[in-house]
Curated annotation (Swiss-Prot):
Record bears the keyword Metal-binding: yes
Enzyme Commission (EC) number: 6.3.4.20
Species this protein is from: Pseudomonas syringae pv. syringae (strain B728a)
Protein function: Catalyzes the ATP-dependent conversion of 7-carboxy-7-deazaguanine (CDG) to 7-cyano-7-deazaguanine (preQ(0)).
Entry-linked HAMAP family: QueC
The protein's name in its UniProt record: 7-cyano-7-deazaguanine synthase
Biochemical pathway: Purine metabolism; 7-cyano-7-deazaguanine biosynthesis
Alphabetized PANTHER family for the sequence: 7-CYANO-7-DEAZAGUANINE SYNTHASE (PTHR42914:SF1)
Transmembrane segments: none
Binding-site positions, ATP: 15-25
Gene Ontology biological-process annotations: queuosine biosynthetic process
Amino acid sequence: MSELTKTEKRAVILLSGGLDSATVVAMARAEGYVCYTMSFDYGQRHRAELDAAARVAGDLGAVEHKVIGLNLNGIGGSALTDSSIAVPESPSEGIPVTYVPARNTVFLSLALGWAEVLGARDIFIGVNAVDYSGYPDCRPEFVESFERMANLATKAGVEGQGFTIRAPLQNLSKSDIVKAGTALGVDYSLTVSCYQADDQGRACGKCDSCRLRAEGFTAAGIADPTRYF
């Protein structure tokens, strides 16, 4: 192992291919991290996000982009993994049916495993608790609790080489996220946020994710490159 490899600052970054996670990759890169990105083919209906994730990883200089296959549609329970459940096209009360049971817990666990193998001590996730859909696994207390678990459940953690779960977007509005990413050179035309995106990555313009994205660009005063079908 070279001296550079020994001393480089590595991070594993969960990259869905959407606006938030693309911004997080740019933020980590700006902090000097060598970026390893991880996406999941979990049976989601909006599979165009996987192509978007690969584009973003390449554009932002990730040294490795890994796609993990999971069969969360075998569990179901979400409009994103069960085609018999419609994606809502208007805001609803409570936790919406687009919540995927335990998704961020599963994703962070696999990112944690890869981070331990790589010798990375920082794991980035693009969760947000301001302009968001109300998912329980996007809240600060979830991130803090997972970090405690990570340091109890791993060889590196119990040997004192602790992990940090970084959620730099946690308290930002969607417009602040758009502004930050734009300043860091994120090409948002490469991203896909829509829960019902077609194979070409074109958005429905009606789902909660589309609404939050459009409102963010409008509030930021930045042109929205989203393509619609």
